[in-house]
Curated annotation (Swiss-Prot):
HAMAP family: PSI_PsaC. GO terms for molecular function: 4 iron, 4 sulfur cluster binding; electron transfer activity; metal ion binding; oxidoreductase activity. GO terms for cellular component: chloroplast thylakoid membrane; photosystem I. Apoprotein for the two 4Fe-4S centers FA and FB of photosystem I (PSI); essential for photochemical activity. FB is the terminal electron acceptor of PSI, donating electrons to ferredoxin. The C-terminus interacts with PsaA/B/D and helps assemble the protein into the PSI complex. Required for binding of PsaD and PsaE to PSI. PSI is a plastocyanin-ferredoxin oxidoreductase, converting photonic excitation into a charge separation, which transfers an electron from the donor P700 chlorophyll pair to the spectroscopically characterized acceptors A0, A1, FX, FA and FB in turn. This is Photosystem I iron-sulfur center. Residues 2-31, 39-68 form the 4Fe-4S ferredoxin-type domain. Its cofactor is [4Fe-4S] cluster. It comes from Chaetosphaeridium globosum. InterPro entries: 4Fe4S_Fe-S-bd, 4Fe4S_Fe_S_CS, PSI_iron-sulfur_center, PSI_PsaC. [4Fe-4S] cluster 2 binds at C21, C48, C51, C54. It catalyses: reduced [plastocyanin] + hnu + oxidized [2Fe-2S]-[ferredoxin] = oxidized [plastocyanin] + reduced [2Fe-2S]-[ferredoxin]. PROSITE patterns: 4FE4S_FER_1, 4FE4S_FER_2. SUPFAM superfamilies: 4Fe-4S ferredoxins (SSF54862).
Amino acid sequence: MSHTVKIYDTCIGCTQCVRACPTDVLEMIPWDGCKANQIASSPRTEDCVGCKRCESACPTDFLSVRVYLGSETTRSMGLAY
């Protein structure tokens, strides 16, 4: 089952989320917005199992990567009525 994976611009390019993902959903891509010149990307969300290990691994105060499961997707992203 795929889940929505959102990467925020607070990503510091540390690769912790990429290394924590057991299904290789995440990868790093070039980005000039941080010192590491890279940001996490989620090109394979169809493989996401919803374990949220990427969230747990994120060292930033505001999680740079979030996994939204099912109905949580619309509610958390402000899309629910």
